[in-house]
């Protein structure tokens, strides 16, 4: 049994960090995303439905602390961290760290930083790599934008997401025109429509009761 302090706050109080540490145990890449909305279903709890990348949210003190944490452990490879901002104390609380890429880690590639590039250049090409901190703006999503627009309650974040979508600086996890065929198209439409149904059903309790 693991007991964890309850940290109040909406889904957008979360932060997600994806990092890569080289064979020399030094951090080579850090990409901090701000989730806009999480999955709401029982089986989806803990997964993100939309993530905003914006250098304005790159908290320098937080990134430095996480960098030192990884290097002090002599970490090697990928690290995926879930963190939440506690408005009561003004501090960030780490929930967990996974030794792998996360389900939503494509948000890093969507921002222009392909995680695999750092792995290949470090392990296979033996390049000397410094620290890169992702600093571009982009919107990653797996849910349809209509769901995000309806359930994201923060007007400032919604305005930022709207702007990125209008500028074409967004990526959808499941949309890949090179893979397109009729069967996939029908599955994709069904999957996206289902987000409206299941989010309406579980929003506010995340499947803890029906």
Residue ranges and their predicted role:
Residues 1:
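Phosphate-interacting basic helix/loop segments used at nucleotide- and nucleic-acid interfaces
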Residues 4-5, 76-88:
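A short glycine-rich, hydrophobically flanked beta-strand micro-motif that places a catalytic Asp/Glu
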Residues 5-74, 98-123:
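ATP-dependent carboxylate/phosphate-activation module, predominantly the ATP-grasp catalytic core
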Residues 18, 82, 86, 146-147, ...:
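Acidic side chains
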Residues 19, 31, 49-50, 60-61, ...:
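A sequence-composition feature that detects small, non-aromatic residues
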Residues 78, 106, 128-129:
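Secondary-structure boundary/capping residues
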Residues 90-93:
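Conserved protein kinase catalytic/activation segment
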Residues 121-210:
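Peripheral (often C-terminal) accessory segments that flank ATP-dependent C-N-forming ligase machineries
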């Amino acid at each position: 049994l693991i007991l964890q302090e309850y940290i109040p706050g909406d889904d957008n109080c979360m932060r997600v960090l994806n990092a890569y540490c080289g064979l020399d145990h030094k951090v080579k890449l850090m990409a901090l995303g701000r989730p806009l909305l999480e999955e709401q279903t029982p089986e989806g709890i803990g997964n993100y439905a939309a993530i905003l990348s914006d250098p304005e949210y790159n908290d320098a003190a937080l990134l430095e602390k996480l960098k030192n944490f990884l290097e002090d452990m002599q970490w090697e490879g990928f690290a995926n961290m879930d963190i939440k901002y506690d408005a009561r104390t003004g501090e960030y609380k780490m929930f967990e760290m996974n030794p792998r890429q996360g389900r939503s880690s494509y948000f890093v590639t969507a921002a222009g930083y392909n995680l695999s590039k750092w792995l290949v250049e470090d392990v296979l090409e033996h390049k000397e790599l410094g620290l890169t901190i992702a600093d571009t703006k982009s919107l990653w999503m797996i849910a349809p934008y209509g769901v995000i627009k309806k359930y994201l309650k923060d007007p400032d974040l919604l305005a930022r997401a709207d702007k990125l979508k209008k500028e074409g600086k967004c990526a959808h996890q499941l949309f890949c025109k090179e893979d397109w065929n009729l069967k996939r198209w029908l599955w994709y439409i069904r999957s996206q429509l289902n987000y409206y149904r299941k989010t309406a059903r579980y929003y506010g309790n995340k499947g803890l009761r029906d």
